[in-house]
Amino acid sequence: MSITTERKQKLIKEYAITENDTGSSAVQCAILTERINNLTEHFKSNHKDHTSRRGLLILVGRRRRLLNYIKKNNVSKYLDLISKLGIRKIK
């Protein structure tokens, strides 16, 4: 259900702006998207897991706030990021 260290390092390497970048908003958004996708798969077989569903909603809200920040500061970066992550635009 959680992300493996190797997968997280791969995401950091793919979305990092500089070599040692681990905390930029794009990297955080990519990691959150991976966690959200993992939880979504978990709910396909565990539909009564309401505690984890609340955690999923918290993660989705955190990702939405990060995407709003990116959109406010750099629209082209935002559009590129959502196309790479495969998520919809925020209204």
Curated annotation (Swiss-Prot):
Residues passing through the membrane, by range: none
InterPro entries from the UniProt entry: Ribosomal_uS15, Ribosomal_uS15_bac-type, uS15_NS1_RNA-bd_sf
Gene3D superfamilies in the record: 6.10.250.3130, S15/NS1, RNA-binding
Keyword annotations: Ribonucleoprotein, Ribosomal protein, RNA-binding, rRNA-binding
The keyword Cell membrane is annotated on this UniProt entry: no
GO molecular-function term, one example from the UniProt record: rRNA binding
Any one Gene Ontology cellular component term annotated for this protein: cytosolic small ribosomal subunit
An example Gene Ontology biological process: translation
Function per UniProt: One of the primary rRNA binding proteins, it binds directly to 16S rRNA where it helps nucleate assembly of the platform of the 30S subunit by binding and bridging several RNA helices of the 16S rRNA.
Family recorded in the similarity comment: Belongs to the universal ribosomal protein uS15 family.
NCBIfam families named among the record's database cross-references: S15_bact
Assembly behavior: Part of the 30S ribosomal subunit. Forms a bridge to the 50S subunit in the 70S ribosome, contacting the 23S rRNA.
Full protein name: Small ribosomal subunit protein uS15
Native species: Rickettsia peacockii (strain Rustic)
